[in-house]
């Protein structure tokens, strides 16, 4: 699952620090979530989906996180 999130982040051409910043997270907090040490909140999942929609209009939260 977490490699999918990293893959989508790479498709956005963003670093962990950049994507974390868009979510209101520090680089370390985002890194912990991407590596599965803590969970993304529902709000963060929605924000990531919204960032991906211009590139992948049909993407779902399930596609990204499950």
Annotate each PLM feature.
Residues 60-66:
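Short amphipathic recognition helices of helix-turn-helix/homeodomain-type DNA-binding modules
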Residues 25-40:
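Recognition helix of helix-turn-helix/homeodomain-like DNA-binding domains
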Residues 16-17, 34, 44:
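Acidic-residue sensor for enzyme active/binding pockets
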Residues 43-59:
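DNA major-groove recognition helix of helix-turn-helix/homeodomain DNA-binding modules
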Residues 4, 29-32, 63:
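Residue-level recognition of specific faces of alpha-helices
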Residues 3-22:
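Short basic helix-loop element that most often maps to the first helix and adjoining turn
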């Amino acid at each position: 699952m977490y490699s999918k999130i990293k893959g989508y982040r790479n498709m956005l051409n963003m670093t962990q620090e950049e994507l974390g910043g868009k979510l209101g997270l520090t680089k370390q907090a985002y890194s912990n979530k991407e590596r599965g040490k803590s969970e993304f909140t529902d709000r963060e999942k929605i924000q990531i989906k919204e960032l991906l929609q211009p590139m992948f209009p049909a993407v779902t939260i399930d596609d990204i996180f499950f």
